């Protein structure tokens, strides 16, 4: 069984919501990434999302764009990201790792070789932001051959037809994009978000995790009251880079934010 499914089953049995942090591999410097991954697990992460740096990250806001620029300045590419996962797996064989990014670097790598190497390294799935499910047939077949999960995005504007298509091809869970625009966007409107989320939830065979716009422990808890889980990216990267630039400890800063989110989410009580 894929680690993602094992984790989701465990969360369901314990009546807990998923917390998934996103960091960009190699940011703010390559030697920190594996330590950050372990720190985030220690601080309450259920699933890790590790970004593959890319020069044209169209869905990302300024925070993650800059993170990718910093990583690319260190010449971080697919092989480096896979090596980071290999290092992480030396002492953590249970926490799911999702690689999030864009199709171009993987296309250049070669789909079959990438999937083979990713699974060997200990990757559990991918989120490819610019690969819509209707165009993913070739990639999906390769991923299935190697046991790599395809995790898709859906949003308030996703049609019923596309949701049906996603239900036929997706594995693990869905990444619910809570806001129009880019990562790190403006404040969430919770009543509207809840209504739109529940519409998609009724159409989905898989759990829906809410990303984009989760900035504070309070916000994470408010969303987790109705959602299957939350994903935090830009807010976490802000904490990491601010600590690094202030010559403070990025591990402590990232761990403090994630721990407070974990506690706030767990304090909402049993799953709805």
Curated annotation (Swiss-Prot):
It is an enzyme of class 4 (lyase). One of its GO terms (cellular component) is cytosol. It catalyses: (1S,2R)-1-C-(indol-3-yl)glycerol 3-phosphate + L-serine = D-glyceraldehyde 3-phosphate + L-tryptophan + H2O. The active site is at residues 49, 60. It holds the Pfam family Trp_syntA. GO terms for molecular function: tryptophan synthase activity. Coiled coil: none annotated. The keyword Lyase applies. CDD domains: Tryptophan_synthase_alpha (cd04724). Pathway: Amino-acid biosynthesis; L-tryptophan biosynthesis; L-tryptophan from chorismate: step 5/5. Keywords: Amino-acid biosynthesis, Aromatic amino acid biosynthesis, Lyase, Tryptophan biosynthesis. Its EC number is 4.2.1.20. NCBIfam families: trpA (TIGR00262). The alpha subunit is responsible for the aldol cleavage of indoleglycerol phosphate to indole and glyceraldehyde 3-phosphate. HAMAP family: Trp_synth_alpha. Belongs to the TrpA family. Tetramer of two alpha and two beta chains. This is Tryptophan synthase alpha chain. It comes from Legionella pneumophila (strain Lens).
